[in-house]
Amino acid sequence: MTEFPKIIMILGAVLLIIGAVLHFVGKMPGDIFVKKGNVTFFFPVVTCIIISVVLSILLNLFGRMK
């Protein structure tokens, strides 16, 4: 039972860090943002590429550990 508070604190810290990183990631150069009148279109091209590369590297590293 003493491990549960530690897990909750670590999970909270991880979520806080992820939230801070994602706040800045969505505004990268290369992301498409078009606003005309009432219509707003946002497509995070560069953000998607960076997330894909990072996830590919992490999954590749975790796959090799087995």
Swiss-Prot record:
Keywords: Cell membrane, Membrane, Transmembrane, Transmembrane helix. One of its GO terms (cellular component) is plasma membrane. Its main location: membrane. The chain crosses the membrane at residues 6-26, 39-59. The keyword Transmembrane applies. It is a multi-pass membrane protein. It holds the Pfam family DUF2905. It is found in: Cell membrane. This is Uncharacterized membrane protein YrzS. It comes from Bacillus subtilis (strain 168). The gene is yrzS.
